[in-house]
């Protein structure tokens, strides 16, 4: 086969996205070191890489590709947290029996797939997580960013380097309007069931010099067992963090806490290939901010307000890439350089089936400023 070519995404009209690339012809079942090197370089350079026509990709090959970015990684990025019934992640994922690092996600009834029989998948609807959902009568045409996040346990396990997401079955073609509903008046036209991406590198670039310095010198402390801790809380309408209504579970109601597993991570992470800084904060899981002068901000409302102020500019419509899924698309995204969100709500009979793989990294994130 000829050498694979990487083509940067052409931004749609009115978009200012400066990330994303497409690779059309690559045999992932027989991936040469040279072709993998091209894909790896593309991931770090473009942050989101779409590999077209991967209908035949096996779960094993998907796992092996994901692991090739980090050979020391072997276990699913959230470990066994899915076993916790109270975790907000619990309902959304099912595991492939013969390749347990690969999850099945989607919407609707699937009679048989890769050893899973008679499963009903549920695409998360924003009304299950947002405090003030869109009225029912507007629900068919309008939607929200469900939850902007990084794929990471944020407790014990290191954030995965890459997530791979394969579209096996995609319902056809209608579009929806994402409403921000935050007073900005912003909306975004998106394909049904898109996955939305925002660049952490652009997020950092958009900061004032003062905010850049604050971000570079500060670290975020995440809650222990964050997806259980946050489970009663409800999201802002932008999907970028939570309302501070004192609904989080008290630490005494969480599973046993290992203090050494609590993560305090830099706000700004360094791209290992390009050296660029990316503002990478999981806004729903933040609990404290450790400032450069040694002080700790532990007022949760204030912590969330600071994170929101830093992150909100980069999720305005012109900076968001909303991928228009086609069956056979395998999207790789640099989980340490972008935030992403589920989007959309499916109607009766709209069936979607995706496979996802991410692996807890062998090494921790690299701070931009040591």
Curated annotation (Swiss-Prot):
| EC annotation from Swiss-Prot or TrEMBL | 1.14.11.48
Report the cofactor remark. Answer: Binds 1 Fe(2+) ion per subunit.
Keyword set includes Iron: yes
What catalytic activity does the UniProt entry give for this protein? xanthine + 2-oxoglutarate + O2 = urate + succinate + CO2
Control of this protein's activity: Cu(2+) and Zn(2+) completely inhibit the xanthine dioxygenase activity, whereas Co(2+), Mn(2+), and Ni(2+) partially inhibit the activity. The inactive metal ions are presumed to compete for the Fe(2+)-binding site. N-oxalylglycine (NOG), a known inhibitor of several Fe(2+)/alpha-ketoglutarate-dependent dioxygenase family members, competes with alpha-ketoglutarate and provides a Ki of 0.12 uM for inhibition. 6,8-dihydroxypurine acts as a slow-binding competitive inhibitor.
Alphabetically ordered keywords of this record: Cytoplasm, Dioxygenase, Glycoprotein, Iron, Metal-binding, Oxidoreductase, Phosphoprotein
Q: Which cofactor does it need?
A: Fe(2+)
Which of this chain's residues are annotated to bind 2-oxoglutarate?
Answer: 195, 325, 352
Record localization = Cytoplasm, Cytosol
Q: What is the effect of changing residue 151 to A?
A: Impairs catalytic activity
* PANTHER family per UniProt: ALPHA-KETOGLUTARATE-DEPENDENT XANTHINE DIOXYGENASE XAN1, DIOXYGENASE RV0097-RELATED
Provide the protein name.
Alpha-ketoglutarate-dependent xanthine dioxygenase xanA
Q: Which organism is it from?
A: Emericella nidulans
């Amino acid at each position: 086969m000829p050498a694979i070519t990487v083509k940067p995404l052409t931004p749609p009209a009115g978009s200012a996205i400066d990330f994303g690339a497409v690779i059309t012809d690559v045999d992932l079942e027989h991936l040469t070191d040279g072709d993998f090197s091209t894909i790896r370089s593309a991931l770090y350079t473009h942050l989101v890489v779409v590999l077209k026509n991967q209908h035949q990709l096996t779960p094993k090959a998907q796992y092996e590709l994901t692991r090739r970015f980090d050979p020391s990684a072997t276990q699913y990025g959230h470990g066994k947290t899915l076993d916790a019934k109270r975790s907000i992640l619990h309902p959304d994922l099912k595991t492939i029996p013969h390749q347990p690092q690969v999850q099945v996600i989607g919407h609707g009834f699937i009679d048989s797939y890769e050893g899973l029989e008679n499963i009903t998948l549920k695409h998360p609807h924003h009304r299950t997580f947002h405090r003030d959902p869109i009225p029912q009568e507007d629900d068919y045409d309008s939607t929200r960013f469900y939850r902007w996040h990084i794929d990471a346990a944020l407790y014990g396990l290191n954030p995965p380097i890459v997530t791979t997401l394969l579209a096996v079955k995609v319902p056809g073609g209608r579009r929806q309007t994402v409403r921000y509903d935050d007073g900005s008046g912003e909306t975004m036209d998106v394909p049904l069931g898109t996955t939305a991406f925002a660049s952490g590198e652009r997020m950092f670039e958009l900061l004032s010099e003062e905010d850049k310095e604050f971000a570079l010198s500060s670290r975020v402390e995440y809650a222990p067992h964050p997806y259980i801790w946050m489970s009663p809380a409800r999201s802002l309408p932008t999907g970028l963090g939570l309302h501070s209504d004192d609904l989080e579970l008290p630490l005494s109601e969480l599973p046993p806490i290992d203090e050494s597993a609590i993560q305090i991570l830099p706000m700004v992470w360094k791209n290992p290939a390009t050296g660029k800084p990316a503002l990478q904060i999981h806004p729903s899981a933040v609990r404290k901010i450790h400032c450069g002068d040694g002080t700790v901000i532990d007022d949760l409302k204030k912590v969330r307000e600071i994170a929101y102020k830093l992150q909100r500019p980069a999720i305005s419509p012109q900076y968001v890439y909303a991928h228009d899924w086609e069956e056979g698309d395998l999207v790789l995204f640099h989980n340490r350089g972008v935030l992403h969100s589920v989007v959309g709500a499916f109607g009766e009979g709209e069936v979607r089936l995706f496979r996802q793989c991410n692996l807890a990294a062998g090494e921790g994130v690299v701070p931009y400023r040591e």
